[in-house]
Amino acid sequence: MSMPFYVSPEQLMKDRADYARKGIARGRSVVVAAYDGGIAFATENPSRALHKISEIYDRIAFAAVGKYNEFENLRVAGVRYADLRGYSYDRSDVDARGLANAYAQTLGTVFTTESKPLEVEIVVAQVGATAHDDQIYRLSYDGSVADEHGFVVMGGEAEQLGTAMTERWRPGLTLSEVLRLVREVLAGPPVDGSPREIPATHLEVAVLDRTRPRRAFRRVAGPVLDDLLASPAGTSGPTGEPGPAGTAATDGGDL
């Protein structure tokens, strides 16, 4: 009679964690950073259809790395959670902390009970009336939650890019300064002595603008993004508002 195969709980959890980390490492990094007028999100993403940065509720946004179908399901669940809570109670009762707790329960349950963990890492951010009131939560594949301040980097090169952000980011940067910094950080170190530059068309950028009265989320693209990346510090407004001729920046929500 053969003995049943046994795997210790410690080894099982380690294998699941390694599996999830490998899946996350294959994704391009996402940087979330505070600026003087709110919170900016940026990632290298040539796709126009598949977003890694999205609006959840009035002043709450979501960013993720990993398997698209898995974090897209989480995004949709987050939108439904926020809508239901806002409808049942009050819109002011919907906050990033509650959403992060809901995500943590889902991620933790899947990690411990399902056959495979979710290969995702997500950030839930909420812009407040002042920079002191901003909330940024980072959630890992196992449901662990970290309360971040200033900026956070996710993805395969998170440690290396996080070091670069630590050295160069500081409170009070304008949106233009933050986006130019993030693009340089995402490009990584020079290759063969030549720095790599990410085209603006390959960047997915959005902001939570604290000056907007209700829906703070705004995508930044087209001429507005070009101006922010090229202009000297402080010449473009922190909101990314369209100019008189119109721009490709979209107003709130996904397409």
From Swiss-Prot:
Which molecular-function annotations from GO does this UniProt entry contain?
A: threonine-type endopeptidase activity
Give the pathway annotation.
Protein degradation; proteasomal Pup-dependent pathway
Keywords assigned by UniProt? Answer: Cytoplasm, Proteasome
**What does its activity-regulation comment describe?**
The formation of the proteasomal ATPase ARC-20S proteasome complex, likely via the docking of the C-termini of ARC into the intersubunit pockets in the alpha-rings, may trigger opening of the gate for substrate entry. Interconversion between the open-gate and close-gate conformations leads to a dynamic regulation of the 20S proteasome proteolysis activity.
Q: Name one GO cellular component term.
A: cytoplasm
Q: Enumerate the subcellular locations listed in this protein's record, separating them with semicolons.
A: Cytoplasm
Q: Name one Pfam family in it.
A: Proteasome
One GO BP annotation is: modification-dependent protein catabolic process
Chain intervals with Low complexity compositional bias: 232-255
Subunit annotation = The 20S proteasome core is composed of 14 alpha and 14 beta subunits that assemble into four stacked heptameric rings, resulting in a barrel-shaped structure. The two inner rings, each composed of seven catalytic beta subunits, are sandwiched by two outer rings, each composed of seven alpha subunits. The catalytic chamber with the active sites is on the inside of the barrel. Has a gated structure, the ends of the cylinder being occluded by the N-termini of the alpha-subunits. Is capped by the proteasome-associated ATPase, ARC.
The entry sums up its family as follows: Belongs to the peptidase T1A family.
Q: What biological function has been recorded for the protein in this entry? A: Component of the proteasome core, a large protease complex with broad specificity involved in protein degradation.
The protein depicted here goes by the name Proteasome subunit alpha
* Gene that encodes it: prcA
